[in-house]
């Protein structure tokens, strides 16, 4: 069994919302609802003050974490929420009755009930694209090249992002070019890798936030 996930470099993310727009376009997400949203964290005020580049602020893309032990799957009374072989958490809309139990169980608030169809919806990690060998839309269209997709069972170093801007060829050819995460971002260490708070669900997505980035040696992870 695999565990597909997304790694986001928060030192690169600019909060441009390209991931949100790409997700909506690829998945037909209704107006007013989001499968991924970008949250601004900070700026954090210091008693002693501070000046650039010690600004202590970052953007945090939030989506389904495709947890290893998802509580939303456990509480679903009809078995509509399922953990798949590739590690993603999906919703069988034919089985969903819109009871909202999974919404209450999710610690990250990334599910909602579609008012038109009365079924729960959330990020699918673009399963329709991944099955064709493509990257999730939020990864492929990230303007800052801050997002990477892969299988945690193969290690984070195996995660890949979209083509480099200098890649030649047609759009389709460019989309076929991938770059490994460590070849695309500033160096990071194990203690620069963070996850959202674990309430027993074991989230799968990772976020890079460097404590040693430039002169910002006292940067802290805040959620």
Residue map of PLM features:
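Non-ligating segments of multi-cofactor redox enzymes
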Residues: 1-223
């Amino acid at each position: 069994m695999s565990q597909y996930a997304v790694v986001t470099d928060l030192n690169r993310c600019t909060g441009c919302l390209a991931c949100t727009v790409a997700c909506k376009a690829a998945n037909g997400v209704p107006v007013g609802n989001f499968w991924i949203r970008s949250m601004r964290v900070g700026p954090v005020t210091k008693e002693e003050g501070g000046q650039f580049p010690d600004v202590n602020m970052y953007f945090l893309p939030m989506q389904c974490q495709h947890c290893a032990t998802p509580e939303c799957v456990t509480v679903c009374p009809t078995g509509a929420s399922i953990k798949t072989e590739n590690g993603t958490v999906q919703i069988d809309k034919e089985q969903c009755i819109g009871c909202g139990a999974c919404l209450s169980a999710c610690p990250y608030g990334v599910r909602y009930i579609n008012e038109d169809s009365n079924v729960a919806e959330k990020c699918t990690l673009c399963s329709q694209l991944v099955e064709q060998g493509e990257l999730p839309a939020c990864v492929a269209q990230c303007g800052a090249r801050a997002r990477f997709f892969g299988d945690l069972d193969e290690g984070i170093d195996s995660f890949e992002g979209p083509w480099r801007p200098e890649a030649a060829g047609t759009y389709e050819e460019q989309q076929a070019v991938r770059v490994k995460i460590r070849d695309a971002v500033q160096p990071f260490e194990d203690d620069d890798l963070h996850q959202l708070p674990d309430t027993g669900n074991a989230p799968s997505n990772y976020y890079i936030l460097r404590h040693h980035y430039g002169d910002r040696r006292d940067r802290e992870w805040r959620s």
